[in-house]
Amino acid sequence: MVKDLKQEIITKYQLHEGDTGSPEVQVAILTQRINHLNEHLKIHKKDYHSGRGLLKMVGARRSLLNYLKKNDIERYRAIIQKLGLRK
């Protein structure tokens, strides 16, 4: 992921100035990485090593979303809606 793109995502989803570790920011960054890797795997179908990394990232994102859902349902709904993860 390009440094500028990552910084842009952080500024878009941060809760306050200097916030880089909130669940919203982490989920947004993971979503970008997942989408990028998904495009890579459409071209390189036999890249099993990257496929495993993709599954680990999806699991990490799922864990963060579960944490948000359990602790603050409004923030969970907001991030899901912003990123378009659920229908």
Swiss-Prot record:
HAMAP family: Ribosomal_uS15_B. The gene is rpsO. NCBIfam families: S15_bact. One of the primary rRNA binding proteins, it binds directly to 16S rRNA where it helps nucleate assembly of the platform of the 30S subunit by binding and bridging several RNA helices of the 16S rRNA. SMART domains: Ribosomal_S15 (SM01387). InterPro entries: Ribosomal_uS15, Ribosomal_uS15_bac-type, uS15_NS1_RNA-bd_sf. This is Small ribosomal subunit protein uS15. GO terms for biological process: translation. It comes from Ruminiclostridium cellulolyticum (strain ATCC 35319 / DSM 5812 / JCM 6584 / H10).
